[in-house]
From Swiss-Prot:
It comes from Rhizobium etli (strain ATCC 51251 / DSM 11541 / JCM 21823 / NBRC 15573 / CFN 42). This is Succinate--CoA ligase [ADP-forming] subunit beta. The gene is sucC. One of its GO terms (molecular function) is ATP binding. The keyword Transit peptide does not apply. The lineage of its organism: Bacteria, Pseudomonadati, Pseudomonadota, Alphaproteobacteria, Hyphomicrobiales. PROSITE patterns: ATP_GRASP (PS50975), SUCCINYL_COA_LIG_3 (PS01217).
Length: 397
């Protein structure tokens, strides 16, 4: 689960992190009062969407010359004008795709005198089985580009879970970021509290880009991104309350209600599979034959007919889907249950695209019999390779 920047900063502020004063608004009419409540005279007006690259993004409804989704304002009047121009419009960034995201809220923040921009994130480094700091002196820009072009400028410091962030760890991080004086002193409290927040809130990612050194020498969190482990949200009512479903794919929200592992993708072949490994293999073979999967959908090992039907309806709700491949290996999951669920869903929503079903495992013959006797236009496949060829051929006509 992701949250907005202003929410992430409020959470970090609660742990004692240095963040600027700011106010979130939902209406342009609130911009003037928000700006007046801040020290000024510089302000930053930030679009709040769950996507990076906001500053370089462009609004669909505005001219190409218009400013992006993060704007500097030098007066309260500028804040108001920018708020009127940004709220309600669609921001397209490198991470949103061509569709973009509608800006439904803004964060009006006090400006900062920036001396240096740094990068700092925490994530789970699975290669060593520890939470690690990933830091770079090249902050305020696309960290993926830095990793590709100048990987030597990125350093990783793994933290021993038994000790937490030690003075030696802080020294390593500070050296990597070339922190001195007041910034180095701030680091002694900042990095341990970031680690504590990451662990206590069950985050999967905490990214600060940029972490700045101000002209007075002190550190400040200028931007913050947080992702949380969805499987741990039951422990965090406060975090769950921050969820903004308008920023999420409607199909993924519906899938979560059925405990389906569903991720929307950009292709045109819908996939319904049981087991994450088989789902990955199914997507791979679709790509091998020249097409792209429209989704990752794992119905799990113990799904009933209703859950299968729900998964099928979610897949068919995607207008990009031009064909559907159902690939089931029945172990705990029974093939006849899959067949009944697919048929129930097809009868309810209709079938306007080709459907190929490959079944193998428990009750496979019964499952095939149910499909064959359904009278529906369902193409049977003998194995995964055969299934992929048939769905691609059906789409190509």
């Amino acid at each position: 689960m992701n949250i907005h920047e202003y929410q992430a900063k409020a959470l970090l502020k609660g742990y004692g992190a240095p963040v600027a004063e700011g106010v979130a608004i939902l209406k342009a009419e609130e911009a003037e009062a928000a700006a007046k409540s801040l020290p000024g005279p510089l302000y930053v007006v930030k679009s709040q969407i769950h996507a990076g690259g906001r500053g370089k993004g462009k609004f669909k409804e505005l001219s190409p010359e218009a400013k992006g989704g993060v704007r500097l304002a030098k007066s309260i009047e500028d804040v108001v004008a920018n708020a009127k121009e940004m709220l309600g419009n669609t921001l397209v960034t490198a991470q949103t795709g061509e569709a973009g995201k509608q800006v439904n809220r803004l964060y009006i923040e006090d400006g900062a005198d920036i001396d240096r921009e740094l990068y700092c994130s925490l994530l789970v480094d699975r290669s060593v089985g520890k939470v690690a700091f990933v830091v770079s002196t090249e902050g305020g820009m696309d960290i993926e580009a830095v990793a590709h072009d100048t990987p030597e400028k990125i350093q990783t410091i793994a933290i021993d879970p038994e000790t937490g962030v030690t003075a030696a760890d802080v020294a390593k991080i500070s050296a990597a970021l070339k922190l001195e004086g007041a910034a180095a002193e701030d680091a002694k409290s900042l990095f341990p509290l970031l680690y504590r927040a990451f662990n206590e809130k069950d985050m999967s990612l905490l990214e600060i880009n940029p972490l700045i050194v101000m002209k007075n020498g002190h550190l400040r969190v200028l931007d913050a991104k947080m992702s949380f482990d969805g499987n741990a949200l039951f422990r965090h009512d406060d975090v769950r309350a921050l969820r903004d479903e308008t920023e999420e794919d409607a199909k993924e929200i519906e899938a979560s209600k059925w405990d389906l592992a569903y991720v929307a993708l950009d292709g045109n072949i819908g996939c319904m599979v049981n087991g994450a490994g088989l789902a990955m293999a199914t997507m791979d073979i679709i790509k091998l034959y020249g097409k792209e999967p429209a989704n990752f959908c794992d119905v799990g090992g113990g799904a009933g007919k209703e859950k299968v039907a729900a998964a099928f309806k979610i897949i068919t709700a995607d207008p990009k889907v031009e064909g559907i491949l159902v690939n089931i290996f029945g172990g705990i999951m029974k093939c006849d249950v899959i067949a009944e669920g697919v048929i129930a869903a097809v009868k309810e929503v209709g079938l306007k695209v080709p459907l190929v079903v490959r079944l193998e495992g428990t009750n496979v013959e019964l499952g095939k019999k149910i499909l064959n006797e359904s009278g529906l236009a369902i193409t049977a496949a003998d194995d995964l390779d055969d299934a992929a060829k048939k769905i691609v051929a059906a789409i190509n006509g």
